[in-house]
């Protein structure tokens, strides 16, 4: 019943943002391929700890792990001490911003060019890693 209601909503939606462990939508019979059969214009934003593909994709992830593995915890704190947590959930915030940027770019592409939906993959670890910029060269 719930999935039927969700599918009905998605038939006319511009986008879906999900933050489940990779493979969850597929287990529910709601893979991007299935959802695009219902609505070819649907933009699907998939947020996870490590992305939808790769060796760590099936691992659950959350901000503190993404911050550590993405490297931004390294730049916080003092030498010879473990890196402390940030005062905010920086990994979640960064990933949300990148996810929205991806959604907006997919929406722009859909409206300007082909009329088709896309899949946007936003990973906490990659979002954090992208903030290292000049730190990597030091």
What annotation goes with each model-predicted range?
Residues 1-2:
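Short, small-residue-biased leader/transition segments that mark boundaries at the very start
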Residues 13:
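An anion/phosphate-binding loop that grips the pyrophosphate of nucleotide cofactors and donors
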Residues 18-74:
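N-terminal Rossmann-like NAD(P) cofactor-binding subdomain of oxidoreductases
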Residues 69-138:
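Acidic, glycine-rich segments within the central catalytic cores of soluble metabolic enzymes
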């Amino acid at each position: 019943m719930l999935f039927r209601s969700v599918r009905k909503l998605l038939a006319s939606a511009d986008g879906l943002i999900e933050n489940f462990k990779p493979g969850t939508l597929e287990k529910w019979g709601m893979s991007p391929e299935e959802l695009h059969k219902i609505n070819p214009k649907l933009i699907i934003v998939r947020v996870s700890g490590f992305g939808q593909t790769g060796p760590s994709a099936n691992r659950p992830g959350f901000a503190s792990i993404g911050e550590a593995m993405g490297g931004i915890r390294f730049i916080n704190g003092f030498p010879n001490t473990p890196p402390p947590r940030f005062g905010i959930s920086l990994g979640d915030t960064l990933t949300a911003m990148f996810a929205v940027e991806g959604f907006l770019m997919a929406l722009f592409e859909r409206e300007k060019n082909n009329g088709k939906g896309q899949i946007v993959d936003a990973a906490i670890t990659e979002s954090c890693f992208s903030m290292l910029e000049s730190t990597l060269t030091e």
